[in-house]
Swiss-Prot record:
Propeptide: 1000-1027
Membrane topology qualifier: Lipid-anchor; GPI-anchor
Intrachain disulfide bonds: C50-C100, C144-C196, C249-C296, C338-C385, C430-C478, C520-C577
UniProt keyword Oxidoreductase present: no
Name under which the protein is recorded: Contactin-5
Tissue specificity: Expressed by subpopulations of Purkinje cells in the cerebellum. Also expressed by one type of Purkinje cell afferents, the climbing fibers.
Lipid-linked residues (GPI-anchor amidated serine): S999
Length: 1027
């Protein structure tokens, strides 16, 4: 009992934790990388990055060399999200291996190890170095003895003074392993001071050693001796796959030895390179196959020396198979396997929640396989598989969830009533969700269900009943039980009579445009409602999207009709009626065949193209259940208005033909063709257009139309025509042949016009008199030859320029700026005028400065405007045509009128009597250079209008009758032969409607334009004829 209570407590706790299906354990997004921190860095801060996802959000802890860091107790440590920040890092306190541990309620995972290393470069000892003295020809080694440093450094040597560096060659070599300078054979030029320079690869810091003097001894020259290998690679060289391997080998000797390399029992890798006068063998991107024994040989005339060493290539572990998150029911068995490759072969360790996992009674670890038998809630957590060899460790993580719950049923299984028909098969689902898997039992009514051949409990717990009958009706209950509890669902089964259906008619043949009604009747259990569904080719008919072609009609509860109106070809197919009840669904189908015009023929192929014909072939399209009776060929060109029917051979293309010849095409024209089929129902859609083709070239057959003459210059024959359309040019190189001859002669002159767009030709001959008749015809040609000529027409050469001057030239001054010029012209036979030109100039000017105005045709007068007033002008008139100008007439003289008076009528007075307005004003006296006053004009217009009524008078008074009700504007101006003078200021006069106005109602008004004062005494004023 206590055991059950404990399990129940764990179960309830876990259910609370797992209530949110989206929760999951930590997953690393970013793990820390190795960091090299320069001790002289200005930032004074190290950041080790770590970030993980999880729900709930994970928390973070950090380990250094396997011990947890207490971030809270040391101010130098801080956490930003998951990253560890170390302020003022110290090599003694902080260098080492770091790991990030991230945790949420589902467990913990441990990151890879990241190494924090400090970069620095110490100083050389300041102690003076002893001189090295050797004999000439002897070999020597100068020691660098570098200071303390981290990480790697680069060596170079300075000779005598910076920056004179020692150049490496076959005689001198600087080892990047020891930093020493090796001179295989010392020469007198080598005497001097040598300084070792080292550079940190991370900080780029440099330091110089104290100088080492090199001197020569006085006891003679060193004799020849065999090579002695002073620099060689280790006996065993290890390298990671993909890195670059550098192996050094250098020897002292006299003469200077030569270095050679080889791979023992194999060939040197093709990618291998020899550096520094062959003293370094470099193998980039080293692979496992590059491993083996390598030999360095130093040789000179005195002998040779050999060194051999082994290159071993290792690989870091790499995953082949990782872990996957797993969910198990309580009591099941877990088997996880992770696989990795590497050289040496990796070994495996397992962690649970960041802590090593050890074998127990239920837990077994064999190499890369973890097995846990009979899992329970305590096994849930985050697991990690570690694959490691001596060169590295990799981590794979996964979450194990243990499901433990009492049985529950999904809502979709809670069907209270199941209605079926006799003979049906029914499955009553019973699939409770539970962990561990529950035991299932069934009851019918109050009794345990007994299985039979018809009634069986399926392996997953559901109940299946075959060939149902009335005896199967009743109440069924399913109960699921496991250690955590139980649950039950109940369903009632009702067995009905099966539904039957009949759809009529069974097969229909109709023609496009006809209509039909399909009837669907159902025989069904009277206790069930029925619903009718209509389909076409298995798809539901959407009555709202069929443009009124379909209508569903339900006349009775057990029947439905489908009306199909104005049938189209697309409506052909299998029509189905489906009857649905709560117990079953049945359907029936009928086929509708629709006859209609043929479908479009297949691809049109164009073959055997000539200049006027093309042979077409096609494949027949659908006949839509009415045999094709004939075909029609259509063509389209850039010159046609859409598609046009073309003539064919044969004239009538019967429905069983699949080729024909299009004839009477135009040569050298691009055509597309299509085919249209017809049957007794009608004509169908056309085929797709064929590829565009061009007919062959041919001699042109269409001459130009409307050949005629045009006006031109003297001695010219101008021949014009309508250009031939490109449609009828029949080929490239199209042009015109212009033929002409004087009327009555025999020989033709021919001229070629090469432009296909040309519409005229001008022939010039100084000996041709004006209006000489010519016979003319225009032919055509192209690259294939000459075509026909147009019919012969007779045209005349250009007429001559006019020879006679106009006579009876008269000029009349009309105003200050207008002169009317009139003339007569003598008729000529060879120089008919097209118009006249009037030249005019002022009396003080030369005729060459004359301004010119032309008439538009054979007119006999012209009004000159825009002239200066009171000015004497000279005028001439001459005729002109296309050939040129005729002689001018004798010049005539005429003066424009003086300017009209510039002074407006003054002291304008008026009396209004109803609609009558009596006006009076003082006379206008013109200046000496102005025209005499001949009379006056009174201008009357309604306010807002532009057209004025003009009243002329010889007197200085007038009576104006206002025509209608409104406000009127009145102005007065003088009239002279020079034109109208300046108008007086406007007078606004209202017009009143009504009866007669007495004298007492009369009003005298005065408007003065002068500066003098005028006083009027009104006693009685009656309008008279004199005012």
């Amino acid at each position: 009992m206590m055991w059950l209570s404990w399990k129940l407590f764990l179960f309830l706790s876990l259910i609370g934790c797992l209530s949110e299906s989206v929760d999951y354990g930590p997953v690393f997004v970013q793990e820390p990388d190795d960091v090299i921190f320069p001790t002289d860095s200005e930032e004074k801060k190290v950041s080790l990055n770590c970030q993980a996802h999880g729900s709930p959000t994970p928390t973070y802890r950090w380990l250094r060399n396997g011990t947890e860091i207490d971030v809270e107790s040391d101010y130098r440590y801080s956490l930003i999200e998951g990253s560890l920040i170390i302020s003022n890092p110290n090599e003694m306190k902080d260098s080492g291996q770091y790991q990030c541990l991230t945790t949420n309620m589902f467990g913990s995972i441990l990151s890879r190890e990241a190494v924090l290393q400090f970069a620095y470069l110490g100083n050389f000892s300041g102690r003076t170095r002893s001189a090295v003295s050797v004999r000439e020809g002897q070999g020597v080694v100068l020691m660098c003895s570098p200071p303390l440093h981290s990480p790697e450094i680069i060596y170079s040597w300075v000779f005598n003074e910076f920056p004179s560096f020692v150049a490496e060659d076959s005689r001198r070599f600087i080892s990047q392993e020891t930093g020493n300078l090796y001179i295989s054979k010392v020469q007198t030029s080598d005497v001097g001071s040598y300084i070792c320079l080292v550079k940190n690869t991370v900080t780029n810091a440099r330091v110089l050693s104290p100088p080492t003097p090199l001197t020569l001894r006085n006891d003679g020259v060193m004799g020849e001796y065999e090579p002695k290998i002073e620099v060689h690679f280790p006996y065993t060289v290890t390298a990671a796959r993909g890195t670059t391997v550098k192996m050094e080998c250098f020897a002292l000797g006299n003469p200077v030895p030569t270095i050679s390399w080889k791979k023992v029992n194999g060939h040197n890798p093709s990618k291998a390179r020899l550096r520094k006068s062959q003293a370094v063998l470099e193998i980039p991107n080293v692979q496992l196959e590059d491993a083996g024994m390598y030999e360095c040989k130093a040789e000179n005339s005195r002998g040779r020396n050999v060194f051999r060493g082994q290159l071993q290539v290792y690989t870091y572990p790499q995953w082949v198979e990782k872990l996957n998150d797993t969910e198990l029911d309580s009591g099941e068995q877990l088997r996880w396997e992770c696989k990795a490759t590497g050289k040496p072969r990796p070994t495996y360790r397992w962690l649970k929640n960041g802590v090593p996992l050890w074998p127990q009674s239920r837990i077994e670890m064999i190499n890369s396989v973890l097995m846990i038998r009979t899992v329970n809630i305590s096994d849930a957590g985050m697991y990690q598989c570690l694959a490691e060899n001596k060169y590295g460790t990799i981590y794979a993580s996964a979450e194990l969830k243990i499901l433990a719950s009492a049985p529950t049923f999904p809502l979709n299984q809670m069907r209270k009533t199941i209605i079926i028909t006799k003979g049906q098969e029914v499955v009553i689902e019973c699939k409770p969700q539970a962990s561990p898997k529950p035991t299932i039992t069934w009851k019918k009514g109050d009794k345990a269900l007994r299985e039979s051949k018809r009634v069986t409990i399926l392996p997953q717990g559901s109940l299946r009943i075959l060939n149902a009958s009335k005896s199967d009706e009743g109440r069924y209950s399913c109960r699921g039980v496991n250690v955590f509890g139980s649950a039950e669902i109940v369903a009632s089964v009702s067995v009905k009579e099966p539904t039957r259906i009949e759809l009529t008619p069974k097969k229909i043949e109709l023609t496009v445009g006809e209509s039909i009604v399909l009837s669907c009747k159902a025989l069904h259990d009277s206790t069930l409602d029925v619903t009718f569904y209509w389909t076409l080719n298995g798809q539901p008919i959407d009555f709202d999207k069929e443009d009124g072609h379909f209508e569903s009609i339900k006349a009775q509860a057990s029947s439905a009709d489908l009306m199909i109106r104005n049938i189209l070809l697309m409506h052909a197919g299998r029509y189905g009626c489906r009857v649905q009840t709560a117990a079953d669904a049945v359907s029936d189908e009928t086929e509708l065949l629709v006859r209609g015009p043929p479908g479009p023929p297949g691809v049109v192929i164009v073959e055997e193209i000539t200049d006027t014909t093309a042979t077409l072939s096609w494949s027949p399209g659908a006949d839509n259940h009415s045999p094709i009776s004939l075909y029609n060929l259509q063509a389209r060109s850039p010159f046609s208005l859409g598609w046009q029917t073309v003539k064919t051979v044969p004239d009538v293309i019967s429905g069983d033909m699949e080729s024909a010849m299009a004839v009477e095409l135009n040569p050298w024209v691009e055509y597309e063709f299509r085919v249209v089929a017809t049957n007794k129902i009608g004509t169908g859609d056309p085929s797709a257009p064929s590829r565009m083709i061009r007919t062959n070239e041919a001699v042109p057959k269409t001459p130009p139309a409307n050949v005629s003459g045009r006006s031109g210059r003297r001695h010219e024959l101008v021949i014009a025509w309508e250009p031939v359309s490109e449609e009828f040019q029949n080929g490239e190189g199209f042009g015109y042949i212009v033929a002409f001859r004087p009327n009555g002669t025999r020989g033709w002159k021919e001229k070629m016009v090469t432009s296909s767009d040309a519409s005229k030709f001008i022939y010039r001959d100084e000996s041709v008199p004006p209006l000489t008749p010519f016979e003319v015809k225009v032919g055509v040609y192209n690259n294939k030859g000459d075509g026909p000529f147009s019919p012969i027409v007779v045209i005349c050469s250009a007429e001559g320029e006019p020879t006679a001057a106009p006579i009876d030239v008269k000029a009349t001054s009309l105003s200050v700026s207008e002169i009317l010029v009139a003339w007569k012209h003598i008729k000529e036979s060879l120089g008919r005028p097209q118009g006249f030109e009037i030249g005019y100039w002022k009396d003080m000017e030369q005729e060459e400065a004359a301004e010119k105005v032309k008439t538009a045709g054979n007119e006999s007068s012209l009004l000159l405007t825009g002239l200066e007033g009171n000015t004497l002008y000279h005028l001439t008139v001459r005729a002109y045509n296309a050939a040129g100008y005729g002689p001018p007439s004798t010049a005539v003289r005429v003066a424009t009128k003086k300017s009209p008076p510039s002074q407006a009528p003054s002291n304008v007075m008026w009396i209004q009597d109803g609609s009558h307005v009596s006006l009076g004003w003082e006379p206008v006296r013109p200046l000496a250079n102005e025209s005499e006053v001949m009379g006056y004009k009174v201008l009357l217009r309604q306010e807002g209008q532009s057209n004025s009524q003009v009243i002329e008078t010889q007197k200085t008074s007038a009576v104006v009758i206002l025509p209608d009700v409104g406000v009127y504007i009145i102005e007065v101006c003088a009239v002279s032969e020079g034109g109208d003078g300046t108008a007086s200021p406007q007078i606004r006069v209202p017009s009143y409607a009504g009866g007669k106005v007495t004298s007492a109602q009369s009003t005298l008004h005065m408007f003065s334009t002068s500066s003098s004062s005028v006083t009027l005494l009104l006693v009685l004023m009656v309008p008279s004829t004199s005012w």
